[in-house]
Structures are given as C-alpha cells and as structure tokens.
C-alpha cells in the first residue's frame, strides 16, 4: 500500500552559512578556489605572452602593473596563504606519527611544513633572480 503523504522537508534560509563562524570560515576557505583559478588563467596568459615574443611579453608586464590587477593578485596571494595554512593544519590530523611510543603533536609537523615551504620558495626565487 502506498501513501500520498509528503515527507517533511525542513526549510533552509539562503544565509544559513552566516550564522556560525565555522561555516563562514569554511565558505571563505573554499572560495580560495576562485583565486586559484585566477592565478591559473594569469599563468597561462603569461606563458602565451612569453611564447609570443618581446612585444607580447611587454604587454603582459604592462597588464600586471595595472593597479586593479595588483590588488587582485594581492588577494590571490592572501587566498593561497590561507589555503596553505589550513592544509598544513590538516596534515598532522591525517598522519599519525609515533616516535618512541608517543604520538607526535601537530606543532612540529606544521612548523616543518612551513619551513620546507619557505626554503623551497627562497630557492626558486634565488634561481629566478640569477
């Protein structure tokens, strides 16, 4: 026997995520995908400009000097740093590191990840500026 009764569906306001700080931070963290997309498009544009020759590269550099583009790139950098920070905080939770029968805390792992990131960044910048 079937019933024609409608199931209860709880209504949800469009601003449900604004009520708790956890949800707001989650939306902010997930929105870093937009800045990552911007950087990817910018990088592809730069590669095509590099391939296009001196004039094309000069136009790309001029494009990057636009104040609006500089502001968007600063926001992109902040988004990348936020995304990196949250992933580094997640890494110790995903890996159980046991040393001498004791589980290692998250602090040393996070510090190591940041140290490696800074060292690799400095090496890449050093090579690029030579």
Curated annotation (Swiss-Prot):
Highest taxon of source: Bacteria
The record's Pfam families line, in alphabetical order, gives: Fumarate_red_C
| This protein's record includes keyword Cell inner membrane | yes
**Which topology term describes how it sits in the membrane?**
Multi-pass membrane protein
Q: Which GO terms describe its molecular function?
A: succinate dehydrogenase activity
Q: What Gene Ontology cellular-component terms does the record carry?
A: fumarate reductase complex; plasma membrane
Keyword DNA-binding attached: no
Transmembrane residues, as ranges? 33-53, 60-80, 109-129
Keyword annotations: Cell inner membrane, Cell membrane, Membrane, Transmembrane, Transmembrane helix
Compartment annotation: Cell inner membrane
Subunit structure and binding partners: Part of an enzyme complex containing four subunits: a flavoprotein (FrdA), an iron-sulfur protein (FrdB), and two hydrophobic anchor proteins (FrdC and FrdD).
Function of the protein: Two distinct, membrane-bound, FAD-containing enzymes are responsible for the catalysis of fumarate and succinate interconversion; fumarate reductase is used in anaerobic growth, and succinate dehydrogenase is used in aerobic growth. Anchors the catalytic components of the fumarate reductase complex to the cell inner membrane, binds quinones.
| Entry's family note | Belongs to the FrdC family.
Query: What's the name of the protein?
Result: Fumarate reductase subunit C
What is the species of this protein? Photorhabdus laumondii subsp. laumondii (strain DSM 15139 / CIP 105565 / TT01)
């Amino acid at each position: 026997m079937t019933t024609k009764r409608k199931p209860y569906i709880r209504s949800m306001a469009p601003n449900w995520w604004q009520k708790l700080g956890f949800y707001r931070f989650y939306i902010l963290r997930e929105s870093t995908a937009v800045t990552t997309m911007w950087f990817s498009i910018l990088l592809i544009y730069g590669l095509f400009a590099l391939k296009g020759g001196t004039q094309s590269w000069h136009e790309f550099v001029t494009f990057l000097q636009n104040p609006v583009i500089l502001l968007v790139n600063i926001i992109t950098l902040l988004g990348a740093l936020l995304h990196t920070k949250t992933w580094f905080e997640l890494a110790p939770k995903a890996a159980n590191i046991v040393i001498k029968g004791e589980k290692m805390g998250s602090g040393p792992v996070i510090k190591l990840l940041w140290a490696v990131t800074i060292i690799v960044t400095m090496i890449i910048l050093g090579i690029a500026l030579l």
